[in-house]
Amino acid sequence: MRPDVKINDLSLFTLGWLRESVDFPTPQSQTNTIVVPGRNAPIRYTEALGSISYQPREFTILLSMLGSRTQFDSKVAEVVNRFAGRLCKVICSDTPQVYAIGTLEAEPAYDPLTGKGQLTLSCEDGDSYLYHVKETVVTKSGSGTVTLSNDYMPVVPVVETTGETTLAWRVGEEEFRKSVSAGTWEFPEMELQAGENQLTVTADGMTTFRYREGRL
């Protein structure tokens, strides 16, 4: 498979660029510790709110091409004017099922002796998680149990109902129950965790759950 990268669904290979390398390091967790005199262990607040938050994702993409300086400048201008300083969706051909979101900056360099030009695209403010390209949609007709499978990123689904519907689910030891009419709903308490999440639906019509999964 030819290494490529898509930015906002545009293949950079089709613009004449070869992808030399990509660097997508894992974002670090947001940590906050307090050292207390007399204690042998610090007070850690990494999971103080019940879940872990992460630093912005940083990544770098190195592109190259062979040609004259004029050709290089033209190709650089095409990429820079489209994407530099803009919030973009980035998909690598190695992992086409997920995408990153972040603001791109560009740094070109050209060697007249070899005729090789390079363009480095970098991001320092990317979303921590990589998102699934395809939105997850689960539809239930009538009443019954629904299992919502989720990747590692916690996410709150959008619930669409076509009539009077009652939803019931459990988070840890706490139970929740919501009765709604036809419409579109979001319940912060219905945050899906990694793995399988079960809910009970009581309805005569259709109930649809939509959410976008993600992972580090």
Task: Give the predicted meaning of each segment.
Residues 6-11, 124-128, 191:
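Mixed-charge, glycine-accented linear interaction segment located at domain edges/termini
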Residues 1-38:
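Polar/acidic, low-complexity leader/linker segments enriched in S/T/G and N/D
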Residues 24-28, 85-129:
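Short beta-strand and beta-hairpin "edge-sheet" elements
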Residues 56, 85, 192-196:
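Extracellular Ig-like/FN3 beta-sandwich strand-entry sites
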Residues 44-69, 114-128, 197:
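Oligomerization/assembly interface segments of phage tail-like spikes and tubes
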